[in-house]
Amino acid sequence: MDQVMQFVEPSRQFVKDSIRLVKRCTKPDRKEFQKIAMATAIGFAIMGFIGFFVKLIHIPINNIIVGG
């Protein structure tokens, strides 16, 4: 019985902690959501421009190396 309790007790504690976490969590309000969405959009745009410029620089260099 003691071995069973050693297995069950961590699971029970995990469930208890998880329930407490979910009860503490709150949804972001509209202002906070807009701030997060704007930061994400700016990050996507920056990464897109970086990728575009890397490709823009890489194509002529690749043509010079390959000789095409």
Curated annotation (Swiss-Prot):
N-acetylmethionine modification, residue list: M1
The keyword RNA-binding is assigned to this record: no
An MF annotation (GO) of this entry: ribosome binding
Disulfide pattern: none
Transmembrane annotation, as ranges: 33-61
Keywords recorded for this protein, A-Z: Acetylation, Endoplasmic reticulum, Membrane, Phosphoprotein, Protein transport, Translocation, Transmembrane, Transmembrane helix, Transport
One GO CC term on file: membrane
Source superkingdom: Eukaryota
Tagged with keyword NADP: no
Phosphoserine: residues carrying this PTM: S18
Membrane topology: Single-pass membrane protein
Compartment(s): Endoplasmic reticulum membrane
InterPro entries: Prot_translocase_SecE_dom_sf (IPR023391), Translocase_Sec61-g (IPR008158), Translocase_SecE/Sec61-g (IPR001901)
Extracellular side stretches: 62-68
Cytoplasmic domain ranges by topology: 1-32
GO biological process, one term: post-translational protein targeting to membrane, translocation
Stored Pfam families: SecE
Family from the record: Belongs to the SecE/SEC61-gamma family.
Subunit structure: The SEC61 channel-forming translocon complex consists of channel-forming core components SEC61A1, SEC61B and SEC61G and different auxiliary components such as SEC62 and SEC63. The SEC61 channel associates with the multi-pass translocon (MPT) complex.
Protein purpose: Component of SEC61 channel-forming translocon complex that mediates transport of signal peptide-containing precursor polypeptides across the endoplasmic reticulum (ER). Forms a ribosome receptor and a gated pore in the ER membrane, both functions required for cotranslational translocation of nascent polypeptides.
Official protein name in the record: Protein transport protein Sec61 subunit gamma
Gene: SEC61G
